[in-house]
């Protein structure tokens, strides 16, 4: 039974052709449908096309980090402050540099008809508001991922203690809850980046 037969290899290669090789392969079609559904979910506009690319990339990277960390080490890197802060700072910096390079930046910093004192005070408020965004993104993502992990594990442990450990569906339910938390938090983070880019 441990021998590999020619027909097994042939069937494996035959199926791989349909998955990867052809122009309209299953994997290519699946990726296209997934990206089109993301465009529908995020409700992108054509006014700032780069923002959709950045937020879809952010969404996919966060999902990959969450699922990769969870299924290999049972704790995702988005629950760690260091990873989340660096990722939020880079994402925020891309939005800030995009905003500074636009023509709206000078109008945003000094409104016509305002006095110098009001302009200075509003400038300080806007600077504090801009620089607090990566911290807010970091805290929001880290706390929500960690709390989601803890709540789903507490529910799993409570159900396991009350019903016993013979039910495999409890493990599946806990994993599905974790995956739902990952999906929602990745969506919220990338949606906030999209909104920051479209300001």
UniProtKB/Swiss-Prot annotation:
Disulfide bonds: none annotated. SUPFAM superfamilies: F1F0 ATP synthase subunit A. Mitochondrial membrane ATP synthase (F(1)F(0) ATP synthase or Complex V) produces ATP from ADP in the presence of a proton gradient across the membrane which is generated by electron transport complexes of the respiratory chain. F-type ATPases consist of two structural domains, F(1) - containing the extramembraneous catalytic core and F(0) - containing the membrane proton channel, linked together by a central stalk and a peripheral stalk. During catalysis, ATP synthesis in the catalytic domain of F(1) is coupled via a rotary mechanism of the central stalk subunits to proton translocation. This is ATP synthase subunit a. Pfam families: ATP-synt_A. Subunit of the F-type ATPase which has 2 components, CF(1) - the catalytic core - and CF(0) - the membrane proton channel. The lineage of its organism: Eukaryota, Metazoa, Ecdysozoa, Nematoda, Chromadorea. InterPro entries: ATP_synth_F0_asu, ATP_synth_F0_asu_AS, ATP_synth_F0_asu_bact/mt, F0_ATP_A_sf.
């Amino acid at each position: 039974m441990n021998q590999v037969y020619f027909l097994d290899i042939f069937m494996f290669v035959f199926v791989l052709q349909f998955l990867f090789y052809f122009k309209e392969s299953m994997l290519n079609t699946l990726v296209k449908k997934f990206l089109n559904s993301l465009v529908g979910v995020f409700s992108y506009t054509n006014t700032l096309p780069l923002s959709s690319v950045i937020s879809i990339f952010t969404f996919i990277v966060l999902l990959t980090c969450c699922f990769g960390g969870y299924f290999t080490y049972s704790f995702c890197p988005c629950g760690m402050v260091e990873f989340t802060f660096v990722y939020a700072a880079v994402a925020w910096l891309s939005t800030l540099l995009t905003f500074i390079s636009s023509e709206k930046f000078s109008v945003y910093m000094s409104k016509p008809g305002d006095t110098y004192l009001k302009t200075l005070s509003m400038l300080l408020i806007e600077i504090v508001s801009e620089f607090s965004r990566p911290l807010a993104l970091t805290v929001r993502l880290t706390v929500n991922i960690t709390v989601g992990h803890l709540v789903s594990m507490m529910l799993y442990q409570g159900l396991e203690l009350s019903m016993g450990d013979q039910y495999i569906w409890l493990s599946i339910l806990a994993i599905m809850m974790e995956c739902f938390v990952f999906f929602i938090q990745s969506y919220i983070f990338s949606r906030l980046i999209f909104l920051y880019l479209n300001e």
